[in-house]
Amino acid sequence: MARPLPLNKDLIVCVPSNYSNTSRGKFFENFCADILRRQSYRIDGMEVRKSGMEIDIQATHTPSNEKLYVECKFMQQKVDSSVVDLAFSQAFRLRVKKIALFSISDLGKDAQSTLEDYRLDERIDYSFFDKKEILISIIATGKVEDIPTDDIPAKYTS
């Protein structure tokens, strides 16, 4: 049966309304750390303070022993270029060659351009996980079940 509209999968992360911004951030950091653990990363530290900066997650890929610096942003507004710049500069100062930025929101226009510029720099491997990438990751880990489009009754429309 042909569908008139394509179905888009989305990720909505819900936290209790009484959570403070700090509690929301910690929840999301733990959520991201769990995804990384299921991708063969060992979590070396959470909210690590070094040389005047805070690192949300420090991890090591166990098969390759490569270090990963992770920045987590749990916010509704688009990520701006200052966040992308900050993650790059902190990873560079720490001499970490892999960066992952996790966010439930998209990159703003300037942030997208900034990320593309950094991805051209061969010294650092910079990954961005938006909610679509995060959803793919948690489906791959088996934490949530992916429902095939054909299994969704046709009476549900967007």
For each feature predicted by the language model, list its residue ranges.
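Mixed-charge (Asp/Glu-Lys/Arg
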Residues: 1-158
